[in-house]
């Protein structure tokens, strides 16, 4: 899939007849489906154990694709419906327009498997308000569409029942590309949902502003709040090395 996407996007980049790109997930059960759940973890594990060089090739090609998307010269619209995690974030966060729905489940869960937020996570997580990026990068918390909007990981949230109409607008053959794009954006604006900031605990910023993982863990351990206890319990099950790497990565991404 990575190679196919790269090849197609490069062809479209050079094609003057292609004015914009829109990307979505699909499923057998309907026109729209989960956007992208990321890489095949079983493949990663087996390849690492066996010393399969395809593992290095995969990551090299994936990161090339991410770079291509983040620097794409034409409008690139990502309809982030359903699951959008890991690699799915890598092919959506560089979009000109990021659209989520009430069905979206957005996350960078790499620390769950002893990895760090890759696919551009060191670039887009620092752009979250305050120190939410550090919190999301270390915990891998799954956000709804409207929560992702509050974290600056989406531009608009809409009801999923409006997706088919938006796609139909873009597929219209009776309007110019510019008119279709403007109509699509206008329709999204009219049906947009409000961001949900209710999940942003007041302790997030004062805790995750710290530079060292040990300081963050100590603050969480000493706090009496339910949020801190749950967060401490969660992080205690993760690799300290990879959490430290992730924290440093996101801090450096601010500069």
Where are these regions (language model features)?
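Glycine- (often His-adjacent) and acidic-residue-rich active-site loop
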Residues: 25-64, 114
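Contiguous mid-protein beta-loop-alpha structural module that forms a pocket-lining wall or clamp
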Residues: 120-177
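Charged, low-complexity intrinsically disordered regulatory/assembly segments
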Residues: 229-232, 243-255
């Amino acid at each position: 899939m990575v190679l196919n996407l790269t090849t197609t996007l490069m062809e479209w980049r050079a094609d003057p007849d292609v004015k914009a790109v829109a990307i979505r997930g699909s499923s057998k059960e309907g026109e729209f489906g989960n956007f992208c759940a990321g890489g095949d973890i079983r493949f990663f594990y087996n390849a690492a154990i066996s010393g399969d060089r395809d593992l290095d090739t995969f990551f090299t090609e994936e990161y090339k694709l991410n770079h291509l998307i983040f620097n794409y010269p034409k409008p690139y619209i990502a309809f982030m419906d359903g699951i959008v995690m890991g690699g799915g974030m890598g092919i959506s966060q560089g979009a000109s327009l990021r659209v989520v729905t009430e069905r979206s489940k957005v996350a960078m869960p790499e620390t769950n498997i002893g990895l760090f937020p890759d696919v551009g996570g060191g670039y887009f997580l620092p752009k979250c308000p305050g120190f939410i990026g550090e919190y999301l990068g270390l915990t891998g918390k799954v956000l709804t569409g409207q929560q992702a909007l509050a974290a600056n990981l989406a531009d608009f949230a809409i009801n999923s029942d409006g997706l088919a109409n938006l796609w139909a607008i873009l597929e219209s053959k009776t309007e110019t590309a510019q008119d279709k794009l403007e109509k699509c954006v206008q329709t999204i604006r009219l049906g947009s949902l409000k961001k949900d900031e209710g999940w942003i605990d007041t302790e997030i910023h004062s805790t995750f502003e710290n530079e060292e993982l040990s300081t963050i863990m100590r603050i969480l351990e000493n706090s009496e709040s339910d949020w801190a206890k749950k967060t401490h319990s969660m992080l205690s099950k993760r690799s300290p090395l990879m959490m430290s790497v992730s924290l440093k990565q996101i801090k450096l991404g601010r500069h």
